[in-house]
Amino acid sequence: MKFLDQVDLRVSSGDGGKGVVAWRREKYVPKGGPSGGDGGDGGSVYVEADENLYTLMDLSHNTQVFAEDGEPGGRREQTGASGEDKVIRVPPGTVVKTQTGEVLGEVVEPGQRICVAEGGQGGRGNAFFKSSTNQAPRESQPGEPGEERDLTFELKLMADVGLVGFPNAGKSTLVSSVSAAEPEVADYPFTTLTPQLGMVYVSEYETFVMADIPGIIEDAHEGKGLGLQFLRHIERTSVLLFVIPITSQDLGEEYEALLHELESHEASLLDKPRVVALSKIDILAPDERALLPDVVADEFPDDVPLLPISAVADVGLDQLKYTLFDTVHSTQSADAIDA
């Protein structure tokens, strides 16, 4: 299925049904009183998270979504039927915004629902206006109009670990090696053109979800490259995994450049715990691999784990999975306590 993470859609809730003017028509009651019923309420438009959806592609086939109008009131004070609500189903992690950028809400948990356009209230029939001083009112109300809104649906993938790196750092190879995901892998930049999710199994009962996004390039925050438009997908992650190949001319400089691009997009990303995977170590001899963390330690902060790996040669992947799982677990436990 093609991946789509942003869609514009016009939503329209239903108008309220009109109230009616009617009179009782009963045998032996020549002057029956008012009996006009109220109109039904218009249907509302809701957005609901569906755990079976992973993309907004289904929404791209429509330009507008309508809920039903309410029915007019009837005789004998019958209230008109309410219009049927319209439910827009989206993947968990979807944010709904107005065209001005105002966030109406987000749906994170499966089944969570928010109202994005409320139906109009039904109008009053003449029976409502009867009083001691007005026994035969001829007044009724039209229904209130529904709402029409132009909305933007923005998907932020739900993952535990977000991969960060420049193009051709080996992120896609890593995801395919530690999970069941099958991203395109090739020896040229930008093989990842859309975000990829992979479930990583540490043990039978210990798992986490990893998200790979297109590689970032320098000055991505100025609109260059592909990665910046997908950075929203790592905003919800608990841990950031920086993938830096040892073939880089300056490992520390590459790490700082990635931090700069993240901060330019969303400063709060730098508050997340980080792990650095030094990739492509299969080009080194075994004795050189073991010394690598000590050799490059001065180029990275002391509190950031440095893990040499080779996804191609299956070196260091188990240790990477254990470290990531422990970091995710401790971070989420701390967040739960703070909440």
From Swiss-Prot:
Annotated positions binding GTP: 165-172, 190-194, 212-215, 279-282, 310-312
Major location category of this protein: cytoplasm
Single GO molecular function: magnesium ion binding
Names of the cofactor(s): Mg(2+)
PROSITE patterns the UniProt entry points to: G_OBG (PS51710), OBG (PS51883)
Region annotation Disordered: where it falls in the sequence: 66-86, 125-148
Gene Ontology biological process terms, A to Z: ribosome biogenesis
Gene Ontology cellular-component terms listed: cytoplasm
PANTHER family, sorted: DEVELOPMENTALLY REGULATED GTP-BINDING PROTEIN-RELATED (PTHR11702), MITOCHONDRIAL RIBOSOME-ASSOCIATED GTPASE 2 (PTHR11702:SF31)
Stated name of the protein: GTPase Obg
Organism of provenance: Salinibacter ruber (strain DSM 13855 / M31)
